[in-house]
């Protein structure tokens, strides 16, 4: 979702309008590549916990932690890829290289599943003691996971940006994005259901082999369309100006801050282009020194900046302040995402000890349960855009702000964790009576998670895109991915802490108290929601006010 906005912006500023490359001739190449890569990435990541438990004899909690680390890398690496594409190589080379790296990783996973000596000996039926994986086994496994996560992360956001760059008209870009997300979710659902089902009921070798075939086809298709693509030119690092602000303010830390507009620098690196900000704001006043002109900062004859690391424009200073203002909200989103990703990992472990049979011949794969979140989120996003948000605007003559949407999502996330605690308590009682609980009891919490994500995920992107500096919008929208990545790492640490200090998370959760873990997450969620309300109360939007006035003149000022 983050690429929806970033790709649109990049498409308008990159590429040669007069070039014959690009256009709808690139459409099948882009979507075929996306479909294959989506099937591949979701096909292995959704069932990773089960693979580690069944094929590598790794204990359930440790498997959940490894899965969280892998998912964290999947979420963090897109930002690295976006920076590399924006600053050095462009999107097309990054996608090609990432697709090939992903192919190497999934081929190695297929070999691991095919060759017995690359895995520990399987546990004997009824045996408690199993052969643990050797250092060689783990080394090969981690190499494969590093390759597939790097490859998948390198294409997750750059595919949308590269696709948008092929079109000049915003209408065409919008049409492309509709197809882009339809294809993305189709691939995700296929990987999380069909591929996972094959892995559970046929063989891991066949499941990973199909992923490898999909990856290979997508790589060949993408490279085949290279001559038709419009190649975007790297625009330089968007973070340079931010670093310059810190350096300039530090160098001139003893300078006296002025109240006169003429004492501040109002031009960017190109002296003929004047920036929009007039006077630096009063917040974070120590940074205003970065734009304060001294006698050694300007070349009096040419009017140019002598040293760009000593003088920034007022706009560059204000851009940096905008990031600092968003940071407390960013932390709040991390703290609510951490319990959410931990919840999805624990539900997979719960599913493994439930009755997953639906009818005499079908068994729900534990790794496929998370597809409920994806399907629910898709449905609710459509309902929000076509029904809920228009109805709210009609009744109140106002639009829901991004922070209001995030708040709704946080409340729903807390409710889902509370419901998971109640369901787990019921499951433990059924285990005591000698009857496993039906897996259907796990569906309602996942549905609520999906509804909450439908409010939070687009709103987070809307918030970052609208409040970040224009020069950083391509990277800003991917910050949602960074949030998710950090949350996976924090959830891994939290699981380890709970294991060390309590008996709630043994390797056999039938003898644990996962319900207490959920209640702990509920308490943390409530505390974080209070922190979020405080941050939202004091936060002042940078751009939303004008947008609201334009969209609905009846609103007046906020």
From Swiss-Prot:
GO cellular component terms, semicolon-separated: plasma membrane
Swiss-Prot/TrEMBL keywords: Membrane, Nitrate assimilation, Transmembrane, Transmembrane helix, Transport
Keyword Transport assigned: yes
Tissue specificity of this protein: Expressed in flowers, siliques and root epidermis or cortex. Detected in shoots.
Gene Ontology MF terms in the entry: nitrate transmembrane transporter activity
Pfam families on file: PTR2
Induction remarks: Up-regulated upon nematode infection.
Membrane-topology descriptor: Multi-pass membrane protein
Chief localisation class: membrane
Subcellular location: Membrane
Keyword Membrane: yes
InterPro entries xref list: MFS_trans_sf (IPR036259), POT_fam (IPR000109), PTR2_symporter_CS (IPR018456)
Transmembrane segments: 33-53, 69-89, 92-112, 128-148, 176-196, 203-223, 329-349, 371-391, 403-423, 439-459, 478-498, 517-537
Top-rank taxon: Eukaryota
Family the UniProt entry places it in: Belongs to the major facilitator superfamily. Proton-dependent oligopeptide transporter (POT/PTR) (TC 2.A.17) family.
Role, per record: Transporter involved in a passive nitrate efflux.
Name this polypeptide is given: Protein NRT1/ PTR FAMILY 2.3
Organism annotation: Arabidopsis thaliana
């Amino acid at each position: 979702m983050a690429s929806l906005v970033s790709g649109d912006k990049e498409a308008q500023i990159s590429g040669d309008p007069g070039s014959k490359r690009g256009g709808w001739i690139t459409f099948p190449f882009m979507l075929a590549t996306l479909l294959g890569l989506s099937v591949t990435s979701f096909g292995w990541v959704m069932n990773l916990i089960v693979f580690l438990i069944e094929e590598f004899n790794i204990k359930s909690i440790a498997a959940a932690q490894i899965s969280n680390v892998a998912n964290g890398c999947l979420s963090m690496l897109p930002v690295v890829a976006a920076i590399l594409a924006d600053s050095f190589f462009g999107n097309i080379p990054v996608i090609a290289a990432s697709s090939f790296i992903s192919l190497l990783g999934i081929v190695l996973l297929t070999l691991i599943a095919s060759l017995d000596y690359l895995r520990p000996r399987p546990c004997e039926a009824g045996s408690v003691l199993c052969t643990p994986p050797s250092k060689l086994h783990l080394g090969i496994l981690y190499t494969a996971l590093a390759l597939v996560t790097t490859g998948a992360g390198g294409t997750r956001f750059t595919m949308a940006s590269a696709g948008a760059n092929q079109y000049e008209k915003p209408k065409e870009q919008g049409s492309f994005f509709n197809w882009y997300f339809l294809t993305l979710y189709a691939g995700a659902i296929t990987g999380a259901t069909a591929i996972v089902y094959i892995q559970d009921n046929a063989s891991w070798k066949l499941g990973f082999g199909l992923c490898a075939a999909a990856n290979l086809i997508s790589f060949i298709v993408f490279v085949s369309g290279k001559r038709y693509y419009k190649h975007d030119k790297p625009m330089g690092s968007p973070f340079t100006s931010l670093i310059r602000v810190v350096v300039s303010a530090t160098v001139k830390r003893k300078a006296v801050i002025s109240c006169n507009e003429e004492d501040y620098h109002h031009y960017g690196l190109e002296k003929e282009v004047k920036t929009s900000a007039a006077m630096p704001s009063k917040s974070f006043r120590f940074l205003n020194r970065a734009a304060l002109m001294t006698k050694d900062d300007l070349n009096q004859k040419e009017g140019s900046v002598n040293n760009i690391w000593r003088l920034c424009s007022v706009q560059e200073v204000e851009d940096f302040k905008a990031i600092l203002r968003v940071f407390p909200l960013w932390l709040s989103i991390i703290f609510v995402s951490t319990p959410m990703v931990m919840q999805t990992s624990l539900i997979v472990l719960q599913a493994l000890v439930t009755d997953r049979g639906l009818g005499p011949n079908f068994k729900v794969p534990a790794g496929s349960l998370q597809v409920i979140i994806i399907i629910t989120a898709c449905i609710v996003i459509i309902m929000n855009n076509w029904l809920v948000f228009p109805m709210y605007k009609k009744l109140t003559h106002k639009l829901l702000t991004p922070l209001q949407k995030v708040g709704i999502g946080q409340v729903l996330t807390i409710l889902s964790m509370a419901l998971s605690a109640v369901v787990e308590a019921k499951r433990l009682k059924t285990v005591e009576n000698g009857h496993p609980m039906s897996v259907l009891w796990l569906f309602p919490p996942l549905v609520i998670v999906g509804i909450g994500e439908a409010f939070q995920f687009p709103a987070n992107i809307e918030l970052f895109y609208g409040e970040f500096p224009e020069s950083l919008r391509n990277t800003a929208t991917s910050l949602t991915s960074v949030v998710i990545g950090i949350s996976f790492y924090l959830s891994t640490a939290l699981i380890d802490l709970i294991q060390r200090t309590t008996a709630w998370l043994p390797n056999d959760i039938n003898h644990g108290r996962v319900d207490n873990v959920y209640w702990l997450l509920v308490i943390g969620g409530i505390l974080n929601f209070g922190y979020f309300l405080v941050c939202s109360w004091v936060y002042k939007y940078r751009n939303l006010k004008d947008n609201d006035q334009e969209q609905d003149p009846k609103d007046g000022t906020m």
